[in-house]
């Protein structure tokens, strides 16, 4: 899958952020544009979070299918899964909301696939947050590598038979809408060190999914970061309501993490130890296809509700325009 640049093979990674169906449609636009530029098939590694995991896992599972992007768009246009999963979990005392979510993903997207079904596609990281240790917890498969799950503190184990739908559900278990995924020692042996692990939305730790792409063993040369998450809203007159103040404080912390991740990408590349980064966010106006696309795209809610035709059109157009503009400015050699 690597691309040849100046006579040498180079590896491309694509990071797909969290942000619900809005982010998934934004990423769809990015992947459509990469496909039209002849670069999607050259992607060696996908690192995904939450809404990005929904899109990335489905595309990776069906990597060879010509209609995969059309099928993803149809899914985003016709499914609203959050409400049904929440209500179903409340009414059913024997099955949690997260179990309902995983079953919904499996029915509509993954059809019983396990991580081992990803072997023909790029290396895929589905990122969650381990609330037991505070670390990023990943599920990884594809790219002719082993299927694994784990984290740096507790350890990594084989996971060929782990359900793809459960991995995506863990990555998108946004609190408090969905409870975390609990994994016990029989399924993840290192969990015995802490009784069990509880996995929540990967965006709690790293909403852009950048961490796996910077690991030396993945040897990435170019990093495209598609950030469809919620941009920080500057409010000249913030409310004094306790709940809103807490929300603003959390948003500021997330914005700081986002900025630090971007700085880390830049510094590593400038030091010669990291890939060339091409990062853009849903509120980026520099490179938008049409005036107002960034504002409209940013105003769409970050939930798991179906998107209408106008929303999908803008998100897809905006994502495609931004990724092409970044490549043409920062890595034109990829288009040579």
Report residues per predicted region.
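N-terminal regions that are enriched for targeting/export leaders
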Residues: 1-6, 12
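Flexible loop/turn segments at secondary-structure boundaries
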Residues: 21-24, 53-56, 133-135, 206-208, ...
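Patatin-like phospholipase
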Residues: 9-15, 20-104, 140-141, 145-148
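Non-catalytic peripheral regions of patatin-like phospholipases
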Residues: 64-101, 142, 191-336
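Active-site gating loop/helix substructures
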Residues: 22, 78, 84, 88, ...
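Extended, Lys/Arg-enriched charged tracts that mediate electrostatic binding to polyanionic substrates
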Residues: 101-122
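Structural recognition of the beta-strand scaffold that forms the well-ordered cores
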Residues: 13, 45-48, 125-127, 199, ...
């Amino acid at each position: 899958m690597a691309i040849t640049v100046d006579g040498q093979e180079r590896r491309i990674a694509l990071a797909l952020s969290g942000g619900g169906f809005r982010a998934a449609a934004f990423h769809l636009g990015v992947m459509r544009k990469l496909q039209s530029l002849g670069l999607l098939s050259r992607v060696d590694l996908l690192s995904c979070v939450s809404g990005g995991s929904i899109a990335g896992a489905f595309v990776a599972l069906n990597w060879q299918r010509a209609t995969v992007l059309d099928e993803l768009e149809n899914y985003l246009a016709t499914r609203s899964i959050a409400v049904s999963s929440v209500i179903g979990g409340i009414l059913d005392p024997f099955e949690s909301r997260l179990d309902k979510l995983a079953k919904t993903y499996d029915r509509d997207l993954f059809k019983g696939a396990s991580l081992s079904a990803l072997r023909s596609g790029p290396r895929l990281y589905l990122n969650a947050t381990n609330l037991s240790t505070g670390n990023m917890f990943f599920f990884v498969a594809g790219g002719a590598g082993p299927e694994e799950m784990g984290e740096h503190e507790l350890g990594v184990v084989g996971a060929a038979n782990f359900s793809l739908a459960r991995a995506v559900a863990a990555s998108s278990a946004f609190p408090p809408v969905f409870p975390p995924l609990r994994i016990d020692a029989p399924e993840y042996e290192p969990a015995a060190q802490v009784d069990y692990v509880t996995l929540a939305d990967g965006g709690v730790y790293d909403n852009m999914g950048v961490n796996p792409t910077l690991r030396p063993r993945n040897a990435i040369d170019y990093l495209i970061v598609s950030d469809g998450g919620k941009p920080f809203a500057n409010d000249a007159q913030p409310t004094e309501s306790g709940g809103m103040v807490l929300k603003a404080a959390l948003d500021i912390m997330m914005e700081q993490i986002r900025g630090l991740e971007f700085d880390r990408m830049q510094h590593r590349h400038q030091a010669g130890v990291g890939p060339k980064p091409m990062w853009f966010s849903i509120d980026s106006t520099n490179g938008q296809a049409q005036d107002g696309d960034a504002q409209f795209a940013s105003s769409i809610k970050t939930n798991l509700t179906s998107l209408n035709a106008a929303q999908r059109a803008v998100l897809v157009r905006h994502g495609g325009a931004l990724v092409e503009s970044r490549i043409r400015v920062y890595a034109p050699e990829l288009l040579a």
